[in-house]
Amino acid sequence: MIYLNNVILNDKTLPMCFNLSVNAGERVAIIGESGAGKSTLLNLIAGFEFPAQGEIWLNDKNHTRSAPYERPVSMLFQENNLFPHLTVQQNLALGIKPSLKLTALEQEKIEQVACSVGLGDYLERLPNSLSGGQKQRVALARCLLRDKPILLLDEPFSALDQKLRVEMLALIAKLCDEKDLTLLLVTHQPSELIGSIDQVLVVENGQISQLQKGV
C-alpha cells in the first residue's frame, strides 16, 4: 500500500504537491512530460528526497522521514549500476550482503532469483559480456533479492528496443503476480502496458493531474 497525503516538495524551479493512494498489489503506470515530477515522485516514495510537509505511508507505516534502507521499497533505474569487474553472481550478492560472503542459503537464493529472470546460465559472466536486456535483468534480480513488497521502476527499459521492452514488461508482470508486488512504473510508452496495469497516473507541473483506472 502507498499513501501520500499532501506531500509538498519546495523545489526552486517547480514546487510539487502529491496526493496518491495505491492499494497493495496494484500496478500503476506514471506518465507525463519530462521535468513534470515523475522521477521526483518515486524519489520521495523511496526516501531519496524528503518533503517539506505532508505524510508518506507505505504498508500501513509512516515512512515520511525514514531512510531509504528502512522503507519496504526497491527501485530500478534506467542505469543498471552494475560493477564491471564483478561477475553477475557477485553483482547480485551485493543486493543482500555487501561483503559478498554468502551463506549456502543466500547462495541458493541468488541462484533461484537468477533463474526466475532467465539468468541461471550467466552467473559467472562479467557485465561487459551481456546485452542491454541482460544487464537490466541483473539489476532487476538484485532488486528482487531485497524482498521488498513495493517495486519502483524509473524508465528502466527506455534504452532497449521495443521487442526487449515488451519482454521485460512481461517478465515484470509475471514477477508481480508471483510475489504479489505493488508496482509503480514511469514510462513514455504507456501503450505497451495495456492490459497489464490497474491505473495510469498523469503527472503535470509537479502534481498528479489525472488518474485513469482499468487500462
Swiss-Prot record:
Main location: membrane
Record's keyword annotation contains Translocase: yes
Keywords, alphabetical: ATP-binding, Cell inner membrane, Cell membrane, Membrane, Nucleotide-binding, Translocase, Transport
Compartments reported by the entry: Cell inner membrane
Any one GO molecular-function label of the UniProt entry: ATP binding
Keyword Cell wall biogenesis/degradation applies: no
UniProt membrane topology term: Peripheral membrane protein
InterPro entries linked to this entry: AAA+_ATPase, ABC_SmlMolc_Importer, ABC_transporter-like_ATP-bd, ABC_transporter-like_CS, P-loop_NTPase, Thiamine_ABC_ThiQ
SMART domains in UniProt: AAA
Residue stretches making up the ABC transporter domain: 2-215
Cellular-component GO terms for this entry: plasma membrane
Enzyme Commission numbers on file: 7.6.2.15
Binding site for ATP: 32-39
Matching Pfam families: ABC_tran
Catalytic EC class: translocase
Reactions it catalyzes: thiamine(out) + ATP + H2O = thiamine(in) + ADP + phosphate + H(+)
Assembly notes: The complex is composed of two ATP-binding proteins (ThiQ), two transmembrane proteins (ThiP) and a solute-binding protein (ThiB).
Function field: Part of the ABC transporter complex ThiBPQ involved in thiamine import. Responsible for energy coupling to the transport system.
Membership in a protein family: Belongs to the ABC transporter superfamily. Thiamine importer (TC 3.A.1.19.1) family.
Record's protein name: Thiamine import ATP-binding protein ThiQ
